[in-house]
Amino acid sequence: MKKILIMAGGTGGHVFPGLALAEALADKQVKTVWLGTCNGMEKQWVDAAKIPFYTIAISGLRGNGLLGWLKAPFNVFKAWRQARYIIQQEAPDLVLGMGGFVCGPGGLAALSLNKPLVLHEQNATPGLTNKLLAPFAKKVICAFPQSTIKGKQVTVIGNPVRSGLESLPVVKAHSPRHLLVLGGSRGALALNEMVPEALSLLPEEQRPQVIHQTGQKTLQQAMSSYEAANVAADVVPFIDDMVSAYQQADLVVCRSGALTVSELMAAARPAILVPFPYAVDDHQTANAQALVDLNGGEVLQQADMTSELLAERLQFWMADKRCETASRSIRESAPHSAKEKIVDELLTLCDSSVH
């Protein structure tokens, strides 16, 4: 039985694509084990998926000051030894890095043991670890063609996304329009305030039906904003059935995390994207550009956004079949079947490593 060790940690943006691949690999009779960090949130998700879970002691360098940088070589060496021991014990056919601090020492350990290393980069702007490891990897799989990682080992496939999105029909003309606002698990305060204000500036006959997902922490703030603006909306902390939510939507207003942009592509839903302004290396702006390049939306920087500007852009997109045209453009040009294609790549590399 083939075995793949998956390295991922830190945020859902790294962990959830790894879990999607682990599930698809299990369907192909491939065993997976997981390497994460001691203090990351990934353990609860991986345990829930019943995947054997190992940890190493490593954390990020950004924001740790001079002392953190001075300690870094010793911490990386210690984590490298831990990862090397785990890889020796598990003896995987291949090591897959999905992102997070764990991939630095884990990737170096895999290389030191001559294990094939595959990297998956979810964002258009690669993280530091992937940039450093990419020249030594057997394969680098990128989500977006805008990625700055280059080389003969690089291939653009996409991000694994939830099942059912790619089979959704494209947007069809109807009235009223349906607007989906996604604040993410932690909420987006700027969207909570700005979207209700913008909608209040539209004539009532032009206002769309609204579903606004806020996250638990900002639910009350968003509900108060809609009430103050005298705008009707279905405000919810979480959406259990995202496929249905995308199916109903004609237009989406959201941040531009890698998985959100990939889901928009898979669902063929146009969007007004408001990148999180404090993202590392401004990677959300680069992610957003991937959808814009498919004629599937536009970027509004939070610093430039006013309720008047957002109202004008909402009117623009909801008029003259622009949503329908953009939806068709996305469906015709966006990557598809990413999960299946990545699994095929991994199985091929596993076979070549055995022989």
Curated annotation (Swiss-Prot):
Residues holding UDP-N-acetyl-alpha-D-glucosamine: T11, G12, G13, N123, R162, S185, I239, A258, L259, T260, V261, S262, E263, Q284
Membrane-traversing stretches: none
An annotated GO cellular component: plasma membrane
Known EC number: 2.4.1.227
Keywords assigned: Cell cycle, Cell division, Cell inner membrane, Cell membrane, Cell shape, Cell wall biogenesis/degradation, Glycosyltransferase, Membrane, Peptidoglycan synthesis, Transferase
KW Transferase (keyword) present: yes
Keyword Transcription regulation on entry: no
UniProt topology in membrane: Peripheral membrane protein
UniProt record similarity statement: Belongs to the glycosyltransferase 28 family. MurG subfamily.
Function: Cell wall formation. Catalyzes the transfer of a GlcNAc subunit on undecaprenyl-pyrophosphoryl-MurNAc-pentapeptide (lipid intermediate I) to form undecaprenyl-pyrophosphoryl-MurNAc-(pentapeptide)GlcNAc (lipid intermediate II).
Protein name as catalogued: UDP-N-acetylglucosamine--N-acetylmuramyl-(pentapeptide) pyrophosphoryl-undecaprenol N-acetylglucosamine transferase
Species the sequence originates in: Hydrogenovibrio crunogenus (strain DSM 25203 / XCL-2) (Thiomicrospira crunogena)
